[in-house]
Amino acid sequence: MTIFIGSDVAGQRLKDVVKTFLKENNHDVVDVTEGKELDFVDSTLAVVHEVQKNDDNLGIAVDAYGAGSFIVATKVKGMIAAEVSDERSAYMTRSHNNACMITMGSEIVGDTLAKNIAKEFVNGHYDGGRHQIRVDMLNKMC
């Protein structure tokens, strides 16, 4: 599993905090916006395109509020993403929705919460079963 992470200018500092945390916990992390000053549309699309290359990939996009990146990610065919600002939602969106990407806002969550969100998201696993019906419905919309 590779975790692709990216941010716009407003999310750079928090993205770096999360990236460092994930690397310290032995995750394979690729920063697709390192050294770049992008808006949330371009930074999110950079994450989405990498995530979609392999079913095992995950993505995290950070902007000021998380909403912009969420809107962009969910416009891409086949992408199931969630805007999260708490650990439980990050975990549940993996286990129930089979989300492969989350977005969060640097103006909404602090460093510790962002680390915990990332931890729960990457440690979550899709439960399948009764949840597959909804995932199939989402995929059928594309």
From Swiss-Prot:
Domain of life: Bacteria
Keyword Chloroplast part of the UniProt annotation: no
Catalytic activity: aldehydo-D-galactose 6-phosphate = keto-D-tagatose 6-phosphate
Keywords in alphabetical order: Isomerase, Lactose metabolism
Any single biological process term in GO: D-allose catabolic process
Pathway membership, UniProt: Carbohydrate metabolism; D-galactose 6-phosphate degradation; D-tagatose 6-phosphate from D-galactose 6-phosphate: step 1/1
An MF annotation (GO) of this entry: galactose-6-phosphate isomerase activity
E.C. designation(s): 5.3.1.26
SUPFAM superfamilies referenced in this protein's UniProt entry, alphabetically: Ribose/Galactose isomerase RpiB/AlsB (SSF89623)
InterPro entries named among the record's database cross-references: LacA, RpiB_LacA_LacB, RpiB_LacA_LacB_sf
NCBIfam families: lacA, PRK08621.1, rpiB_lacA_lacB
Matches recorded under PANTHER family: GALACTOSE-6-PHOSPHATE ISOMERASE SUBUNIT LACA (PTHR30345:SF5), RIBOSE-5-PHOSPHATE ISOMERASE B (PTHR30345)
Family classification: Belongs to the LacAB/RpiB family.
Quaternary structure and interacting proteins, as annotated: Heteromultimeric protein consisting of LacA and LacB.
Name this protein carries in UniProt: Galactose-6-phosphate isomerase subunit LacA
Source species of the chain: Staphylococcus haemolyticus (strain JCSC1435)
